[in-house]
Amino acid sequence: MNTEMYQTPMEVAVYQLHNFSISFFSSLLGGDVVSVKLDNSASGASVVAIDNKIEQAMDLVKNHLMYAVREEVEILKEQIRELVEKNSQLERENTLLKTLASPEQLEKFQSCLSPEEPAPESPQVPEAPGGSAV
């Protein structure tokens, strides 16, 4: 970095910020961004030019991000459609299997699904804090 030509700390800071901004946005976009050279005679105009370049780069990044987000949203919508369709198909298959199964098969299947759950015919009575049933 060549900072000898800059007289004030502000000029050096602007130069460093410019280089950081350009290299940061270049790395994000994967392309080359033209550098703006600062000189002592027109530092005010250079700062405006730098601000404009930074704003343009930020707009470009924003546009790229918006495009990527829209693309991802479309992909996710398609996945949701596919999952809803598959879910409907599985529900139809489940209904068909339930209608074709005998009551004994259904009972056996239900017992295999939830062996640790209590039977629904024995309701649980909540206990009061003192240990007695309410």
Swiss-Prot record:
The modification Phosphoserine is found at residue 102. One of its GO terms (biological process) is negative regulation of activation-induced cell death of T cells. Keywords: Acetylation, Cytoplasm, Nucleus, Phosphoprotein. It comes from the Eukaryota. GO terms for cellular component: cytosol; nucleus. Signal peptide: none annotated. It holds the Pfam family TSC22. Transmembrane segments: none annotated. The modification N-acetylmethionine is found at residue 1. Residues 1-60 are annotated as: AP1-binding. Residues 76-97 are annotated as: Leucine-zipper. Residues 108-134 are annotated as: Disordered. The keyword Magnesium does not apply. Induction: Induced in T-lymphocytes by IL2 deprivation. The leucine-zipper is involved in homodimerization. Can form homodimers, however it is likely to function as a monomer. Interacts with NFKB1. Interacts (via N-terminus) with JUN and FOS; these interactions inhibit the binding of active AP1 to its target DNA. Belongs to the TSC-22/Dip/Bun family. Protects T-cells from IL2 deprivation-induced apoptosis through the inhibition of FOXO3A transcriptional activity that leads to the down-regulation of the pro-apoptotic factor BCL2L11. In macrophages, plays a role in the anti-inflammatory and immunosuppressive effects of glucocorticoids and IL10. In T-cells, inhibits anti-CD3-induced NFKB1 nuclear translocation and thereby NFKB1 DNA-binding activities. In vitro, suppresses AP-1 transcription factor complex DNA-binding activities. PANTHER family: TSC22, TSC22 DOMAIN FAMILY PROTEIN 3. This is TSC22 domain family protein 3. The gene is TSC22D3.
